[in-house]
Amino acid sequence: MVSDDHQQCAQSKNVCVIGAGPSGLAAARELRKEGHRVVVLEQNHDVGGQWLYDPNTDQTEVHSSVYASLRLTSPREIMGYTDFPFVLKKGRDVRRFPGHKELWLYLKDFCQRFGLREMIRFNTRVEYVGMLDCGELIIGNDLIKWVVKSKEKKADKVVEEVFDAVVVATGHYSYPRLPSIKGMDKWKRKQMHSHIYRVPEPFRNEVVVVVGNSLSGQDISMELVEVAKEVHLSAKSPNISEGLSKVISKHNNLHLHPQIDCLREDGRVTFVDGCWVTADTILYCTGYSYSFPFLDTKGIVVVDDDRVGPLYEHTFPPSLAPSLSFVGIPRKLIGFPFFESQAKWIAQLLSGKRTLPSWDQMMQSVKEFYHSRDVAGIPKHNTHDIANFEYCDRYADQIGFPHLEEWRKGLCISALVNSDANLETYRDSWDDHELLQEALQSPHFTQLNAQAFD
């Protein structure tokens, strides 16, 4: 809702953004646009979040889940922010589905173009975020202030600051989710999550079991078959894509299995159909969990089986909004434009330009959303999997943000269909030329055409 009193109540707030990845950068820009004073705390040495590749996985904490050969699963045309398209650059990766480094460079370009770097404190880990004085919390109290404790990597001192608002933009690819398998704790050979997978060479001549049939699981399996003795892909469902079926038929050392039943101390991995293999390594491509170890909301915001809640529109805790908000929680959507719409809403709420519904209305909305997911049979851990263009458009309507362009939706669907049918080749061979031309002739690209090869 637009506030009638905006002219009288507009004000600048001190806002802390946690994370300088795609969602954090979007938040920082929109907050500053709205006149707020912004500090971004980033634990890495540069911007990019997950897209800042780190080949070193021997350290205690690994922040990036990107492996060396990773390429985008969506075409570059749909990946950019709405007013800063992901265009080709001379001397760089000009493929439609470029490698991870190109997206990281795009984020650096975005940061430079809008002067965001001056707001960011790098190599700074957030240790604690909590309410300054909880006292008797008033529902919807916009006077809540937040204590943020942070520590620079090479410093001994913890810095304590107070902010009017905190935006959590830490992403959802940092905390590996592992399955619960009988005998897992006694299986003495190598077990690892794809979070720390980087290159296939360490698996040369090994028998590897890959758990999880996601795109990352499939990509890593296709990479491993070139060096491993055998690769056994364990999937929840026997119904696999045409593309994966083609890959399996092509490689004699790639085998499909159902879920794992148990692991045995002698190295055997037994599947639910009774088949078994003796493996050297189990590689879990089983996704990630939401985790905010620094955040203390006195139990108001909790993570329950990967459901972060209660959150109104996946963004606002009704009891703490707008002083606490989250950007980048939803999955399975076209991320960059959605991050922007979230960031704009947050920034305008904090300046008084807009208002949220009442606490009762927000909580009712959350309950209705949970109920709709339950009725549809969607597990709780998939609460934030959106996969719905209409939802993104309805969200945008809340702040007058443009709907996703039809070409953007079409290119997204086309890539999904093509990857399903042609898993090995979809990034380099496609038939969406008409949609591509529509995209390149749209204002999204033509408005910055002159800068395409800066």
Residue ranges, per PLM feature:
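Glycine-rich FAD pyrophosphate-binding loop
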Residues: 16-18, 32-59, 227-241
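Rossmann-like dinucleotide/flavin-binding elements
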Residues: 18, 32-33, 196-238, 294, ...
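Glycine-rich active-site loop/strand segments that organize a redox cofactor
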Residues: 43-109, 133, 314-319, 352, ...
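Feature captures the FAD/FMN-dependent oxidoreductase FAD-binding
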Residues: 93-165, 170, 174
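A Rossmann-like FAD-binding core segment of flavoenzymes
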Residues: 128, 145, 161, 222-307, ...
